[in-house]
UniProtKB/Swiss-Prot annotation:
Lineage: Bacteria, Bacillati, Actinomycetota, Actinomycetes, Micrococcales
Family, per entry: Belongs to the universal ribosomal protein uS4 family.
Ranges where the S4 RNA-binding domain occurs: 95-161
Disulfide bonds, paired cysteine numbers: none
Pfam families reported for this sequence: Ribosomal_S4, S4
Record-given protein name: Small ribosomal subunit protein uS4
InterPro entries attached to this UniProt entry: Ribosomal_uS4 (IPR022801), Ribosomal_uS4_bac-type (IPR005709), Ribosomal_uS4_CS (IPR018079), Ribosomal_uS4_N (IPR001912), S4_RNA-bd (IPR002942), S4_RNA-bd_sf (IPR036986)
């Protein structure tokens, strides 16, 4: 029951933001390609600049499944980092442990990836890490604990069952899926990161 409720909530949020946050939400949006609610089919009036920027920020937050406080901290770090703030922001978010667990194909959704981390199934360089926000460094190995490899969901992942719903493995990850191992070979580049976002709108939202 809880899973069904969560799935419906994600589908509703996906329709509201105009982006599929889970494979189930993608199928739901194919059937109902309009916003939620009784007025979802109606033509909407043009959004204000603030509303456009807010929605883009919410879209980015939802794709990484993070809280507003986490987003704000990441933005402040991105702003202090040399380079374009918007690109820096997404690159920093992509180096979160839960994001890389998802990209590697160990999980089907960002929520599942976070659960794997929180429940201590994931190691970084041989050390258990239970913080989804952990920043993985270049060259570090993300892998599943040997005692967890026999779990059915992880056996399913190792067999490549999620590849039909996930983007191709990006070039910044070296993945050995059958071994449930993934190495971050270098810092991700914004152009390679499979998230849908006009990051300049996010920058403008926080800079207002």
């Amino acid at each position: 029951m809880a899973n069904n409720t969560r799935a419906r909530r994600q589908a509703r949020l996906s329709r509201s933001l105009g982006i599929a946050l889970t494979p189930k939400a993608a199928k739901y949006m194919e059937r109902r390609p309009y916003g939620p609610g009784e007025h979802g089919r109606a033509r909407k009036k043009q959004d204000s600049d603030y509303a456009v920027r807010l929605r883009e920020k919410q879209r980015l937050r939802a794709q990484y499944g993070i809280r507003e406080a986490q987003m704000t901290r990441a933005f402040e770090e991105a702003r202090r980092t040399k380079g374009l703030t918007g690109e820096n922001l997404i690159e920093l978010l992509e180096m979160r442990l839960d994001a890389l667990v998802l990209r590697a194909g160990f999980a089907r959704t960002i929520a599942q990836a976070r659960q794997l981390v929180v429940h201590r199934h994931i190691l970084v360089d041989g050390i258990r890490v239970d913080r989804p926000s952990f920043r993985v460094g270049e060259g570090q190995l993300v892998h599943v604990h040997s005692r967890s490899e026999t779990m059915v969901p992880l056996q399913v992942a190792a067999a490549g069952a999620h590849r039909d719903v996930l983007p191709a493995v990006p070039a910044y990850l070296d993945v050995k899926l059958e071994a449930l191992q993934a190495r971050l070979v270098r810092r991700p580049k914004r152009s390679e990161i499979p998230v849908t976002c006009e990051e300049q709108l996010v920058v403008e939202f926080y800079a207002r």
